[in-house]
């Protein structure tokens, strides 16, 4: 009996059951890895371009020196162990960088901020955020928006803030602006003049070790006339150190101009400032309370408060004193 041939459909099933060629598998894996490597290299190049990743040394060149205040991984681990041991005792842990070294923030990790406020509440005495500007290390504007306060505006303080009713027509609600601004500030070194006022308006507390308040710029200089007052206004610092006039005219302050000026002042003393930070930082606990002693003083020096508010506050103080008597 002659055996019948298997149907073609059955014959076609055989090739599909064969094991794939090993070379094909390796080739596919190689292609997949090549794509991953290309994406990795593209990401690496982008980070290097943005300054978030240091460039590798060229072949044959000597390794780059360790930045001032920056410890190697071994040194960091060793100091961390010492800190943990010290934590079991009564004395607070203190780490000091090796002498002769310093570290400063990368330009991409440094921004300057300035806020303008309007008056809300009774007689417009409550300050609320109405405009916020953030500039980069090189002075490029990263954020500049008008912001609608949570309470009705009683006094626009246009002469000082530059804010008018028209600016509020397309203003961003405070809650929305706050999220946008904090996203830009977190993880950054923040520069500004009388920064506590800006953070208070934002209802935000930034780590003290990551703030650079330009009211302290005179401490790093020996310019005559800058130490006559406890705190010098941004306007005076700009004139004496940068030889530029700001906050002039009848249109009020410009938060972009003020933030840019603050960054210029910081860069003027950046080396000295970061050297001091490297010496005084690295204590446990790390952060100190923000200095709020300059709140009212700084606003008055920059002619922020309207005259009628100043008179009103004096009148209220007299009334309170009369009631006590």
Curated annotation (Swiss-Prot):
The keyword Nuclease applies. InterPro entries: Exonuclease_RNaseT/DNA_pol3 (IPR013520), REXO1/3/4-like (IPR047021), RNaseH-like_sf (IPR012337), RNaseH_sf (IPR036397). This is Apoptosis-enhancing nuclease. GO terms for biological process: intrinsic apoptotic signaling pathway in response to DNA damage by p53 class mediator; response to ionizing radiation; RNA processing. Its EC number is 3.1.-.-. The gene is AEN. Residues 110-266 form the Exonuclease domain. Residues 85-105, 281-325 are annotated as: Disordered. It holds the Pfam family RNase_T. It comes from the Eukaryota. GO terms for molecular function: DNA exonuclease activity; exonuclease activity; nucleic acid binding. Keywords: Apoptosis, DNA damage, Exonuclease, Hydrolase, Nuclease, Nucleus. A motif (Nucleolar localization signal) lies at residues 27-35.
């Amino acid at each position: 009996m002659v055996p019948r041939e298997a149907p073609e459909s059955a014959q076609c099933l055989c090739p599909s059951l064969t094991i794939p060629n090993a070379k094909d598998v390796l080739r596919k894996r190689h292609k997949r890895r090549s794509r991953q490597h290309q994406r990795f290299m593209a990401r690496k190049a982008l980070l290097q371009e943005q300054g978030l990743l240091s460039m590798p040394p060229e072949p044959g060149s000597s390794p780059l020196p360790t930045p001032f205040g920056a410890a190697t991984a071994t040194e960091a681990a060793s100091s961390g162990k010492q800190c943990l041991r010290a934590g079991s005792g009564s004395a607070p842990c203190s780490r000091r960088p090796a002498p002769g070294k310093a570290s400063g923030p990368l330009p991409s990790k440094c921004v300057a901020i300035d806020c303008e406020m309007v008056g809300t509440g009774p007689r417009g005495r409550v300050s609320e955020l109405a405009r916020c500007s953030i500039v980069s290390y090189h002075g490029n504007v990263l954020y500049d928006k008008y912001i609608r306060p949570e309470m009705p505006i009683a006094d626009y303080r246009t002469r000082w803030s530059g804010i008018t009713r028209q600016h509020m027509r397309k203003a961003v609600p405070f809650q929305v602006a706050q999220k946008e601004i904090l996203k830009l500030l977190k993880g950054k070194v923040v520069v500004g003049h009388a920064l506590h006022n800006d953070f208070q308006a934002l209802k935000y507390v930034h780590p003290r070790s990551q703030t650079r308040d330009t009211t302290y710029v005179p401490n790093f200089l020996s310019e005559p006339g800058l130490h006559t007052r406890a705190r010098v206004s941004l306007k005076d610092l700009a004139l004496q150190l940068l030889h530029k006039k700001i906050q002039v005219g009848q249109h009020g302050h410009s938060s972009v101009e003020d933030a840019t000026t603050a960054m210029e002042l910081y860069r003027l003393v950046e080396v000295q400032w970061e050297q001091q930070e490297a010496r005084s930082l690295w204590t446990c606990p790390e952060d100190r309370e923000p200095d709020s002693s300059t709140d009212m003083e700084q606003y008055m020096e920059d002619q922020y408060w309207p005259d009628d508010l100043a008179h009103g506050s004096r009148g209220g103080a007299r009334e309170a004193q009369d009631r006590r008597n």
